[in-house]
Amino acid sequence: MSTLGHQYDNSLVSNAFGFLRLPMNFQPYDSDADWVITGVPFDMATSGRAGGRHGPAAIRQVSTNLAWEHNRFPWNFDMRERLNVVDCGDLVYAFGDAREMSEKLQAHAEKLLAAGKRMLSFGGDHFVTLPLLRAHAKHFGKMALVHFDAHTDTYANGCEFDHGTMFYTAPKEGLIDPNHSVQIGIRTEFDKDNGFTVLDACQVNDRGVDDVIAQVKQIVGDMPVYLTFDIDCLDPAFAPGTGTPVIGGLTSDRAIKLVRGLKDLNIVGMDVVEVAPAYDQSEITALAAATLALEMLYIQAAKKGE
């Protein structure tokens, strides 16, 4: 079975239309795209409420509400005029085979990166970030991680496929450097001795955005950065449609401002994960995810326009 655009892809949640109504391209490796969007409809590693496999479709669907604005506020330019972005649809794999998903996603990412493309990926549960990190580390070397989440996902439970273990595994594999990595919005228990800088939700909500960004930049330095945003970083008032919601999170306004503040970092890959639309209200979680994804593209476009 091919990785993209297979005629026998029997998923009910794949490949309806592109993010922001961007063109679909099932052969992105040979395209002239700068950034390639890939959906990963996978939720077998979920510990809470399942349904993240429907996340990519929900993000794409609600993104049509964002497609009309050309000179987007407050950027005052159209990202699409500076970046060539294509959507290659969803990863096709044998549903029920977590190992195949992981291997195919890593191979897909490696092929895109070798062709000079950058990736914005939509989960799916947060486990999908691990094969993406493996591919990016092969191409860019050890990276810094900027991680928005309610949970650190550094738990060691011995399970190969678990959306709470990726950032325990990634440092051990040499993919990321915890000493140059930041976890933002955390509000569950975590290990204070694993090297990561944790900016918990209490302090992020109380501190100024510029102050937080300055600390992030200081920690990350000039390392290549992988940016991952678990939508449960947001308070459930702003993102109820997720598998493991935790009260006391960030507002959507604060999250957007923090993402915009990352513009000067050397970001080499990005993802937005853990949207589970079955638990959403009026698509507000999917809209938050789509908006954050769009802001991620805008910070790339802003650098290209300088």
UniProtKB/Swiss-Prot annotation:
Mn(2+) binds at H126, D149, H151, D153, D230, D232. Keywords: Hydrolase, Manganese, Metal-binding, Polyamine biosynthesis, Putrescine biosynthesis, Spermidine biosynthesis. It catalyses: agmatine + H2O = urea + putrescine. GO terms for biological process: putrescine biosynthetic process from arginine, via agmatine; spermidine biosynthetic process. Its cofactor is Mn(2+). Its EC number is 3.5.3.11. Pathway: Amine and polyamine biosynthesis; putrescine biosynthesis via agmatine pathway; putrescine from agmatine: step 1/1. The keyword Metal-binding applies. InterPro entries: Agmatinase, Agmatinase-rel, Ureohydrolase, Ureohydrolase_dom_sf, Ureohydrolase_Mn_BS. GO terms for molecular function: agmatinase activity; manganese ion binding. The keyword Hydrolase applies. HAMAP family: SpeB. PANTHER family: ARGINASE/AGMATINASE (PTHR11358), GUANIDINO ACID HYDROLASE, MITOCHONDRIAL (PTHR11358:SF26). NCBIfam families: agmatinase, PRK02190.1. Belongs to the arginase family. Agmatinase subfamily. Catalyzes the formation of putrescine from agmatine. This is Agmatinase. It comes from Escherichia coli O7:K1 (strain IAI39 / ExPEC).
